[in-house]
């Protein structure tokens, strides 16, 4: 699907369809008022007859409106004008895309980007429209033999901006939006792949392909079990012991900063391609969704794709910690004591608290890069789902400025995170009689004690932890990976690169 921006009058658009908003109760948006005036009150007459109230989600498709060059006008209900916020704006765009696709409009000029969204500029509105459009049209049908496609799918979308001065920022918004949307799609595709296909080797192959595509400044190295043993990554290795699939850590290095002294930002993704729970096996119900336990790695992969596509002037390293947690004769057990790469020892009380055992060794490994910051992304705890539900990602950090940056980026991207405390009081719950620490700290504050566990391996750099257990996928009828938090991390890196959308 193609996207572009232009600045023009609505009545002069020779398009299959133009899209304008209507507010509650039956109030025309400024652009719709222009069309109404030129059509001698045709649109307002329809509204007076009660054809459209302007409530969110309502639509009315008009054909051959007098004095208008476009074949059709799509009126979209936007709710009350003062209540149009970021979330409502994206829902309006989503409804627009679905309606255009369902009605066979292959191209359209969209004036919704001229609606007022409090505190958001045209760059934001165009970029969010692109990302939302791509999200709306996403489907995962690679493994289906019968693929259903619309008869006349939407192929071209033009977003109108108020003045020619804003064309440059609009074009930049489309460029950024497409790169982020492609990263989200890549993350969703990886997450939705079944575990018999998407194992650690598959993750490694995707990481290598990324380096092949962007060979100018992307290098991928894959570290296998033999090298992990030499490095002392015994905790990571223990988790994969019960699986026939080899544990593989894929390290993607992107160099975009011309300065020799520039330190990298490191992203670490938990990549449990299937988590049965191991010996502490999970209940059968819903276990199929444990293929999504690699969504942290999928998100890091998606972000690295975005960074390489936009050639951001940063150094960024993405680590995909691929592994599979299975029961078996070689599987690690409750009661085992593991010596981590850091030298600290961990008593295993539950083999289903495995993500932190993989991440702790990776967080030690990345010290060698002398990072500016490290952010790990993991479907880590069911406790985070209880705390924050399925809408907001949990954030913990040992560095206040980094935490504030991430929260700000999450708000701007519409991919929200909420900070949880890493208070010393919670550390006591990890005490063990037989090792330096236990791998679980009981039910109270489970998301926080998991963060506390990881914090013991991140003392040499600024670090943040994103627990995406509640936000990485949806269950039920809309089952599938969400691609979160690709948008959050993309915004964070765009901010770091100086692209704050204020041009």
Swiss-Prot record:
Its EC number is 3.4.11.1, 3.4.11.10. GO terms for biological process: proteolysis. It is an enzyme of class 3 (hydrolase). Its cofactor is Mn(2+). Transmembrane segments: none annotated. PROSITE patterns: CYTOSOL_AP. It catalyses: Release of an N-terminal amino acid, Xaa-|-Yaa-, in which Xaa is preferably Leu, but may be other amino acids including Pro although not Arg or Lys, and Yaa may be Pro. Amino acid amides and methyl esters are also readily hydrolyzed, but rates on arylamides are exceedingly low; Release of an N-terminal amino acid, preferentially leucine, but not glutamic or aspartic acids. Pfam families: Peptidase_M17, Peptidase_M17_N. It comes from the Bacteria. Mn(2+) 1 binds at residues 275, 352, 354. Mn(2+) 2 binds at residues 270, 275, 293, 354. It is found in: Cytoplasm. Binds 2 manganese ions per subunit. NCBIfam families: PRK00913.1-1 (NF002072), PRK00913.1-4 (NF002074). HAMAP family: Cytosol_peptidase_M17. Belongs to the peptidase M17 family. This is Probable cytosol aminopeptidase.
């Amino acid at each position: 699907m193609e996207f572009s921006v232009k600045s023009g009058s609505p009545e002069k658009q020779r398009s299959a369809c133009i899209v304008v908003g209507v507010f509650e109760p039956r109030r025309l948006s400024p652009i719709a008022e222009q069309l109404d005036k030129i059509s001698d009150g045709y649109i307002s007459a329809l509204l007076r007859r009660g054809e459209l109230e302007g409530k969110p989600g309502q639509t009315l498709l008009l054909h051959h409106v007098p004095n208008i060059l476009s074949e059709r006008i799509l009126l979209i209900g936007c709710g009350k004008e003062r209540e149009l916020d970021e979330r409502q704006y994206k829902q309006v765009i989503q409804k627009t895309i679905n309606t255009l696709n369902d009605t066979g409009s292959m191209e359209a000029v969209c004036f919704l980007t001229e609606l007022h969204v409090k505190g958001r500029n045209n760059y934001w509105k165009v970029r969010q429209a692109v990302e939302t459009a791509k999200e709306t049209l996403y489907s995962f049908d690679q493994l289906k033999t019968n693929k259903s496609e619309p008869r006349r799918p939407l192929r071209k979308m033009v977003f109108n901006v108020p003045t020619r001065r804003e064309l440059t920022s609009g074009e930049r918004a489309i460029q950024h939006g497409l790169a982020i949307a492609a990263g989200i799609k890549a993350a969703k595709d990886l997450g939705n792949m079944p575990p018999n296909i998407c194992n650690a080797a598959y993750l490694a192959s995707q990481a290598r392909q990324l380096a092949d595509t962007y060979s100018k400044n992307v290098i991928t190295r894959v570290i296998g079990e033999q090298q992990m043993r030499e490095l002392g990554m015994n905790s990571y290795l223990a988790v994969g012991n019960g699986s026939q699939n080899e544990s593989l850590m894929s390290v993607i290095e992107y160099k975009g900063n011309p300065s020799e002294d520039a330190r990298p930002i490191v992203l670490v993704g938990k990549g449990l391609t299937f988590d049965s729970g191991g010996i502490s096996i999970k209940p059968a119900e819903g276990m199929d969704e444990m293929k999504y336990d690699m969504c942290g790695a999928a998100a890091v992969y998606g972000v690295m794709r975005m960074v390489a596509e936009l050639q951001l002037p940063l150094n960024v390293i993405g680590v995909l910690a691929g592994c599979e947690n299975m029961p078996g004769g070689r599987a690690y057990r409750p009661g085992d004591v593991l010596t981590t790469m850091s030298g600290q020892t961990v008593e295993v009380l539950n083999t289903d608290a495995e993500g932190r055992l993989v991440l702790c060794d990776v967080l030690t490994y990345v010290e060698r890069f002398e990072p500016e910051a490290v952010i790990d992304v993991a479907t880590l705890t069911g406790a985070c789902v209880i705390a924050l539900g399925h809408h907001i990602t949990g954030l913990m950090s040992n560095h206040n400025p980094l935490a504030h940056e991430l929260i700000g980026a999450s708000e701007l991207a519409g991919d929200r995170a909420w900070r949880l405390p890493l208070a010393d009081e919670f550390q006591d719950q990890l005490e063990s009689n037989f090792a330096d620490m236990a791998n679980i700290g009981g039910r109270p504050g489970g998301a926080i004690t998991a963060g506390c566990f990881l914090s013991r391996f991140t003392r040499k750099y600024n670090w943040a932890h994103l627990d995406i257990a509640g936000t990485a996928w949806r269950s039920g009828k809309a089952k599938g990976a969400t691609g979160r938090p690709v948008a959050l991390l993309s915004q964070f890196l765009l901010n770091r690169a100086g692209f704050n959308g204020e041009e």
